[in-house]
Amino acid sequence: MNILQTNNMKNEQTYRFGKEEELFHQTILHANNTPAYGLFDGEMGITLVLSDYVRARKRRPIKTAINVLLDNILSNLHKNMPLDFANGLTGIGWGVEYLIQKGFQKGVGVEMCEAIDAKLMEVNLRRVHDLSLETGIEGWLHYIMAHVQGAKLQRREAFEKGFLAECMDVCHQILLEGKADKALLSLSNKMIHILKGEDTPYSFHLGQFIQ
């Protein structure tokens, strides 16, 4: 490889990273204009992706912007927001736990998600027929597991015992019927082990929710 080829490669790499930087700065600038705050298609999803980017590229100015985004999300939560995992409260709560447990953000999960938990515990899980990830039981289980794990790590307790017992009953019923998809069956089994106090870690996989 000659010097000219090497210089061309360096120029291409500089241009590529420049475009990448430009893209992420534009994302930050327009994030507050996003009409939704949720995980799949809103500000929380943007915040998590940017957080991973900050860690990979070590960009402190962007980290400050991420803190502003998270503050904006949490300050705009209200009781009329849906509990949906895709674009509602439980997805936002999952995002909060992601940021704390991955070391992106300081804070106490049970305090930051107190309003989310209160609304979720109003639901009679046994009467919920929607098993989907986006708007139903599967998504809620992701949040509940992440939240219970986060609380345990911080020596706190998430949710009332009666609610967790109800959650376990629902998971047992899902496994007993065996009609759910493989993802929900696996999730229900893991939920039962976690609620029994067994050492079964919940793993965060952002890529399965945000493409």
Located regions from the model:
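Glycan-recognition and catalytic cores of secretory/periplasmic carbohydrate-active enzymes
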Residues: 2-211
